[in-house]
C-alpha cells in the first residue's frame, strides 16, 4: 500500500464566472427556471379550466398580474435564446449536403427561423 496522497485540485463554486463561454452557458441553462414557472402556470390553468368558469376567471386575473407577465416574457426570451443557440449550432453538428455540396450555414439557420415563423403564424391563425 502506498502512503502517497493524490493531488486534488481546489474548485471554487464560482469557477465558471471567470470564463465568458461558461458564463453564457450558465445564463442559458438558468433560463429553464422561468420556463418551469410558465409550465406550472399553464398546468394550473388547465386545472382551473376543469373546475369551472369562476376558477378560470381567477386564473385569468392571476395571469394578468404584472409579475406573472414579466415571468412569461423572460420565459419567452429564454426560449428564443435556446432556439438561437440550437439553430446556430445545427449546421456544425449536422452539415447538410445537396448535390454533393455543403449548404451554406446561414441558409440552414434562416430556414429554421422561417419554419418557426411559419408555424407560429399558423398557430396564431388557428387560435
Swiss-Prot record:
Signal peptide (UniProt feature, chain positions): none
CDD domains in alphabetical order: QFR_TypeD_subunitC
Gene3D superfamilies for this protein: Fumarate reductase/succinate dehydrogenase, transmembrane subunit
InterPro entries for this protein: Fumarate_red_C, SQR/QFR_C/D
Main location, first listed in the record: membrane
Transmembrane segments: 30-50, 58-78, 107-127
Protein's cellular compartments: Cell inner membrane
Keyword Calcium carried by entry: no
NCBIfam families: PRK04987.1
Record-stated family: Belongs to the FrdC family.
Keywords, sorted A to Z: Cell inner membrane, Cell membrane, Membrane, Transmembrane, Transmembrane helix
UniProt name for this protein: Fumarate reductase subunit C
A cellular component term, taken from the record's GO annotations: fumarate reductase complex
Subunit structure: Part of an enzyme complex containing four subunits: a flavoprotein (FrdA), an iron-sulfur protein (FrdB), and two hydrophobic anchor proteins (FrdC and FrdD).
Amino acid at each position: 500500500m502506498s502512503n502517497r496522497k493524490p493531488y486534488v485540485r481546489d474548485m471554487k463554486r464560482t469557477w465558471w464566472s471567470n470564463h465568458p463561454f461558461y458564463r453564457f452557458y450558465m445564463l442559458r441553462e438558468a433560463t429553464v427556471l422561468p420556463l418551469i414557472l410558465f409550465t406550472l402556470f399553464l398546468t394550473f390553468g388547465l386545472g382551473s379550466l376543469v373546475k369551472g368558469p369562476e376558477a378560470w376567471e381567477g386564473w385569468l386575473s392571476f395571469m394578468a398580474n404584472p409579475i406573472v407577465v414579466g415571468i412569461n416574457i423572460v420565459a419567452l426570451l429564454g426560449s428564443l435564446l435556446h432556439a438561437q443557440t440550437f439553430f446556430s449550432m445545427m449546421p456544425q453538428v449536422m452539415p447538410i449536403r445537396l448535390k454533393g455540396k455543403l449548404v451554406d450555414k446561414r441558409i440552414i439557420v434562416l430556414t429554421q427561423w422561417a419554419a418557426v415563423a411559419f408555424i407560429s403564424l399558423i398557430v396564431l391563425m388557428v387560435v
